[in-house]
Amino acid sequence: MSRKPAANKSAKPVPVSVAGGLIDDDGLLATARTQWQFGDWSSLAQISPETLENHPQCALLALLSAAGHLQLGHADTGRNLMHLALAAGCDTRTAARLLISGVYNTLGRTAAMSGHAAPATAHFARSIELSPFRNDSPLIAQARTREQLAQTEQALCPNQTSAPESGTLPTTAGLKVQQLAAFDLGQAWSSNTVNTVIFRHHGILTWGGYQYTAFYVDEATLRVVRRTLANNHIATHDLAGQYNLRDAHNSISLGIDSAGHLHISYDHHATKLRYRRSSHPNAIADWTDEIAMTGVNEDRVTYPTFILPRAGYPLTMLYRDGVHNKGSARIKTYDEQTRNWTDRPTPILSGADQKPWTSNAYWNHPAIGSDGSLHLSFVWRTDSIGEQQLVNNVNIGYAWSPDNGLSWFTSRGQPCKLPMTQVNAETVWPVSPGSNLINQTSMALDSHNRPHIVFYANDSQGVPQYQHIWFDGEAWHQQYFSARTQPFTLQGGGTLQIPISRPEILIDSQDCVYAVYRGDLSGNRMVVSKLLGIQASREAAHAQDNPTCLWPETVDYAEPVIDRTRWCESQMLTMLLQRNQQPNGDLAHQESAAPVWLVDFSLS
């Protein structure tokens, strides 16, 4: 408003009838009251200053209009209208009830943005309970909740209203996202994130015109899916067995040999190897029984990671032998002629023999260069810190191999002696203990085969932020790509309930870099950000902290699972999406199932 309320000579203040803080209303006030009850803040904010100043119900109309402006973030206008309402005769108790009610509504919207439906509903109900109007009923609270949830979803994904519809999604930083196809693969286990942990390698893969994925339907059923890309025909086959799904580490990884035989490894957390392969090329109906690979170092397996055939190199499996703070990264290679696996004798990464403490290297997704080179980045995990059991990941390391893991080099070309340890491995980005550095994120290579790594760790204010580091051939650089304000702590054992997912990274043929993630700032929806230049301050990062929504529904605690093979071939992003719970530490599961989606997107 351009005029100060106290100086307004045209307004006609009238006494406000209040009994116990309850307002009697009629006429135009009834319309505004209904708009307030339903949370139609935009309509309340459209009441013109002239209408307010000249209406006999100026005090109450100004108060309700102020509530609308405050909910829309128009703080100055809302404040001026509050002054007008008080000057026009509204008592402070009534004004206070409206303000406190607005606080609860804001809390509800915040909870909804974070994907927490139950607290959101409770806050909206409390907002209505504090209404200064008579006879506001539970039905009004339900109506308010529906309207506010709809507004929240529209704010997050304004161009989409339902999951399976295709269309152009909202853009940022010149980013255009097109959803091209979505396939409902059926209901499946969703009591934790075992189907959607980011470290599945591969969770989806494309080979020879077919796209493959797999997930757990329940504790007795593992489903393998084959999609024929030419006609989008979906075939499935269920592998019966006994699967421990109550530990989200026990995910499924897929590989394929050059003949088209699918390889699958699953259900591990420092336990005996479980592995099968398909009996026929490009087919999923017949499988071997569970078999060993070599039988050597296969009793404490976690994180099976298949590295696909390329440049004359065979199918390879990288895996952890050991536990979280005493482990070795080992490699096995597959001979298609004999159908036998062979062990590399020396681990490539190990902290198992360190003294006076042991450690373990957690690797990010391996990346493959255009020349067939193999690139790894990793953090080191030691014992937890203190009685609080703070997760202690330190430093980001990097190495690359020109010969499928036989020899390794630093980013500057210096040879590495195997096994690489905390002592002799290259640290490309130092991160101190207790910094909430997350393990097992993602890495990709640009057109010069130079590494880009995304992760999160604390900023200088102790708040975990998404970060991107990369090597330009001479030096490593860093940028933030979030501007979070709420701290959290990685603490305890098992799979944690964390407000943000680990990020995925994609680089297109023009060296544009994208990050895919979900979290508290996106209402737990899956989003993508286009990363721009070297911007190492939180202020600069905030300018690009405006991600584009990929999927309009909350996925709760799921992480991005992508088909990196198809992206590299055709710049098509395919994701496996499912809404998942994740009890902290994998304790106290609540049985649930949710649909699994296979969805194609284009980014431009």
Predicted regions and their residues:
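Start-of-helix register in tetratricopeptide repeats
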Residues: 26, 60, 95, 102, ...
